[in-house]
Amino acid sequence: HPAYAHHPVVGVSWEQATAFCEWRTMFLRRSINREGVLIEKYRLPTEAEWELAARNASSDSRYPWETGDGKEEPDCYPANFNPGEGAYAADNHLIPARVRTFQPNLFGLYEMAGNVAEWTSTAYSGSGAELMNDLNPEYRYDARASDPAILKRKVVKGGSWKDNATFIRSDMRDTELQHRGRSWIGFRCVRTQVSTGK
């Protein structure tokens, strides 16, 4: 619907979000169409990449903004979230807000907390932190349709308009089945920056 042209895309599954990243890569490569030009593919961010971006590269930052949980100044919320019991509209947004409604973080990224939660490429495991390290920074498994549901869970980050301040913290993680779309889950595409060595 045209009224939502500047809102985050929601209701898409992890599989659909991944397919969009692949389509976007193909579209970009066709539009450039030059030999010898390296174009990194679009993809979903890993859980670690997403969290680093949301924390402004600081291990102390719980939220993308400077301090606090966002509830200190009623009528001036830094994100679209549920600031109190049943207070969905207290931040003036009952549903996902338009993109760029709230201030960006220090990296210039908008809505890294609240508004809509976001798919990551990381497979969910309750012991995820133990499975990942510098040599193995991502736990990835692309489940097949025949796999059991427990293998189809993906990490979702950022919280959404329906979540309270605790669940929009950058260190919080949630899970959803990769074939399910939800009205509170969206995605953002990323690309790896290739250094020229200069």
Q: Which residues fall in each region the model found?
A:
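Sequence-pattern detector for short linear motifs
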Residues: 172, 176, 191-194
